Amino acid sequence: NKFNSKGEPLFFESILHFNFKLFKLLRTKNINLNQKDKDENNIIFKLMEYNYKNQIKDKKLYLNTIKSLVNSVVDINAKNKEGLTVLHIAVGEKCEYTLRLLLEMRADCLATDNKGRTIMHNCVWKNTSKYFNLIHHFNKEIINIPDNFGIRPINYAAFMGKKDLVIKMLDAGALVNNSIKKDSRILQFLEKFHSNIINITQNIEKGVDKNNLKLLANNMINEFNIKS
């Protein structure tokens, strides 16, 4: 369980360079596969980092290695120092094939980071709304979970002007009301986006979508103290 000069467990290098002979040798030393580096990343985090930095060319080998590690008791739901899981990272780095694998291996969709945000919040914040349907397919509850500031994903999407995503969320059963107490800091931050709520129905042609957006906006105007 020693570390190298980069603050990583010694076995990380063998996995990151797919040197499985060395890895098998190290395993005879009873290494802890869930050991983390100085930033509290386990080996799956590091593999993913190498991948999104284009340091891994063989994507099939990369995915099979993640699968083998998880099957060898590496914690797929481990968190780093920011409270992020590998699912959060996969969404943020726009890596769909990794995201699909992790979801298929039953990674915890409801895991939250240090700010209480799920991967559905990440879809909004990281501009990866294209993964909404995929995530919602695996978990229907996640759409309405608020973060530590009292904000649901649909609220952030509306404030950020992501109308298409908001409509998808409404069609999928997202709640149009949010009576949860809001943190004063987030209310102040969101003030700069108030106009997006007031104008949310602009350029929306479909009547049912327009009505649903109007209902959401009316609720949010009251809940977030929005002034026209």
Please provide the spans of the model-predicted regions.
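Fold-core signature of tandem repeat domains
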Residues: 10, 26, 33, 43, ...
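Ankyrin repeat A-helix N-terminal signature
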Residues: 13-19, 46-62, 89-95, 122-128, ...
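Ankyrin repeat domain, specifically the short helix-to-loop turn at the C-terminus of the second helix
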Residues: 24-32, 67-75, 100-108, 133-142, ...
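Ankyrin-repeat and related helical/solenoid repeat scaffolds used for protein-protein interactions
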Residues: 125-129, 141-176
